[in-house]
């Protein structure tokens, strides 16, 4: 979903969240001038239903009576209480119950109801139905009234018969209390939905709130409604496609089970009335004018239909038998793939929570069989309402929910502690003082002064808010139950009526548990509260907008010292791993908690350092933007530890470099860290040089150019047990009688032809490979090991009894990807032929897995150069064969104009064999080699090879080419030339102290650095190395030109050996960052710019490089590096 919020969000306005049924939205819409339809922004689909009753939105009370207890003798109704007195007495029921029953069960609607509207209907029923609403309506609101034009009462039996009792089973709490309005705000329509050409029984509950402007209460323009549509029903045969454009609602049907969905709809006009005769449009949803909130296509925007379909599928399976939970889990996995585009959406989270809760329910019942987790404690005390005294002592507070009220939001678990409000049950004959009714029967005046202001408890199950008032909080849903008793008899007690209410509530709760949605969500909340501490700071910041909303509406949370708001930010720095770091810091900076320290004097940086995902970016943003007091952050904590010490202990070198570059004192590391002198010196060396190029790696801070090592991730994902299993399967012993048959036909089976992505020519090459029997190999011993394979040496006896020393390359993994790589390597290696290409003898199935048998050499070229002195004669022998071997690979198919690229050229992959003093160089390891065919286009665009040897264009996503291999050959020849001049072997870029790390590789990619070529080389040889390592592929010579140039250098040397020997005589190694390095880059820059003037780059894909080259000041860069080196 798109988020159109700016970083600088006004505190007074609620941000524009993208559309989701569970998110709070405060929107105002234009009134409809002429149409009787009600315009509600629901989605980009339109839904229609027909009315069953005539509903007026002007009288907003919903009163339908189960029990006809109204006495119509001169009733004086005061303050919305139908106090019926048979003796013509005035019953003043001053019920100051703000928030009487708005927060129950899964509700999160906040109703600060202050204005009560009159209800004049004779047949009422009070529904206290609270769903998983997500609206946050702090409005001066009252009840919703369904005006029944007839005088007939709706009997309970009739409603149950017509609606299969799904009212009681689907909603949270129903209090059937006579003549007592609980500020309910729900309209109910019992309809039938036409869904995918089938009919579904449903109940539609329209939740309405009125928001009035206190300054102008008479102006209807300031009144708005907030609607919630709740659909209950099931369709066992529903199809997956739920994108129907119309859902028609009819009147008559029965429902079969409980499936529900809810959609919040905002803001209709107060004066619009739904007419009974208008059968087309009670509710019509149209596209919202604010298009920014609906940037989704039609298939994704039909949230309601998708949610209906998913719930139907899920509960069709999991509600049949609890033992079939495995089917529910399969559905869960299926939903993950089907709803991948809704990963952060309400639908995805809710459905998975319900599925998981169903499993947890069974597990919990098995572990705690005696737990009353599914009992509704809020009604445990209903039967305590029996009071047989002659006075009207109404023990209302025993009906309160005194056990627990826990609400779960997507961001927080909020808990209300049970305190001592349950001690309000006083059985004195005349006075009930603790929040009870003071009833005096002597004068027949029942003054029910219920001062049970439930202002101390507001619990939200909102996506954005979780609030708790810290007073002795008990939700008094039943505070007014006994007020009904004052409406019936003057001298008789109302205990019977109270008992009736208790029975009704008890019956309701028995049925309510049958609803799978409410039950699952309630169970999930109950199970989670046993594991999560009662702390408001837990997971508060799932969305940075929540911080602003909570701060605006409940600022006391951020000012109360008890809550310690800075802990919220410290917890954020420690654990947050998502995006929008800058927006979060913007919101926290407005609150003013970023610079706060905890009780141990640890600043926010202490916690950000431990964040393995966003730690570097958090520290960089806070320090660079001045959000934190650096001078305070530099100080040590109570334990004498500094931030730099913590970086060392956590081995977080990148943050350590960053902090030192901003002026943190690095000498305290020596004083406080238990490191050896050499360790500290190495750290300083790394820090000083990193400061020189720190300005070149802002992209690495944001993680844009850091490449993930997929192989490493895969290895980490696999558990050790699975790896052992793979090895066990791969190395399973083969019976002797069939081993020869398996070896003989291992490459003749048909499965590898279809199972792996092999081409026709590759299959033909594989079939030509010889199969070597295990008995022909002996004398195994390991000689080397790499990241993907292990090399053994052995003795091979062929059919002519000729003994040949061989090398055996076996692989560490034998999954499908590994087998495909093995087959491709065998295919390429078998097809290549040349005097400088290592010979492939065959393959064999050995105890350590499928292995490749190759010709054995003495050692690789890296070890040879390290162990031997190099002179000019040996230099030309080795260099000539090195470039010849690459030429034999590149030009293997000249007639077909197909080149094979090695893609992993380095000294380790050249092998050398010495016979009678004659050195022969072979190129090997063709695991990454591919041809430049069209089918290999994607493969050649991937980054493959060894870091520090890969050509710069490969990092930028360009196709691999023969010129990319030339760059790698140039790096290897540089290492050979360095040993020639200075007498020691070095790694590429050693003079810059660049290790094989992502941050350092970023420098090579962005600056065009190449290894410093020894200045004592003859100019012709020096220029060849410059060209081979050029950043521009077009500037590099072809492999044929390299062979010719080396041959000319050799001829020049042979014509004047004395001159060359004098120039190439062993010199002392130059110090780092010397003038030669600066002069070299001036030469590179001028040389490349000359090339640009002679070459048309309009059609060249590397023109971006030219702009980078012209804008980059090499001299200032290296002068800066040099100054840091001299300071040392």
Curated annotation (Swiss-Prot):
Entry keyword annotation includes Nucleotide-binding: yes
Keywords: ATP-binding, Kinase, Nucleotide-binding, Serine/threonine-protein kinase, Transferase
GO biological process, one term: mitotic DNA damage checkpoint signaling
Gene3D superfamilies: Phosphorylase Kinase, domain 1, Transferase(Phosphotransferase) domain 1
Low complexity bias (residue ranges): 1-17, 243-256, 375-502
Ranges for region Disordered: 1-21, 60-100, 131-151, 236-256, 375-504
Pfam families recorded: Pkinase (PF00069)
Record-annotated active site: 904
GO cellular component assignments: cytoplasm; nucleus
GO molecular function list: ATP binding; protein serine kinase activity; protein serine/threonine kinase activity
Reaction(s) this enzyme catalyzes, per UniProt: L-seryl-[protein] + ATP = O-phospho-L-seryl-[protein] + ADP + H(+); L-threonyl-[protein] + ATP = O-phospho-L-threonyl-[protein] + ADP + H(+)
Segments forming domain Protein kinase: 777-1054
Binding-site list for ATP: 783-791, 809
EC identifiers of the protein: 2.7.11.1
SUPFAM superfamilies reported for this sequence: Protein kinase-like (PK-like)
Top-level taxon: Eukaryota
Family assignment from sequence similarity: Belongs to the protein kinase superfamily. Ser/Thr protein kinase family.
Protein name from the UniProt record: Probable serine/threonine-protein kinase DDB_G0283337
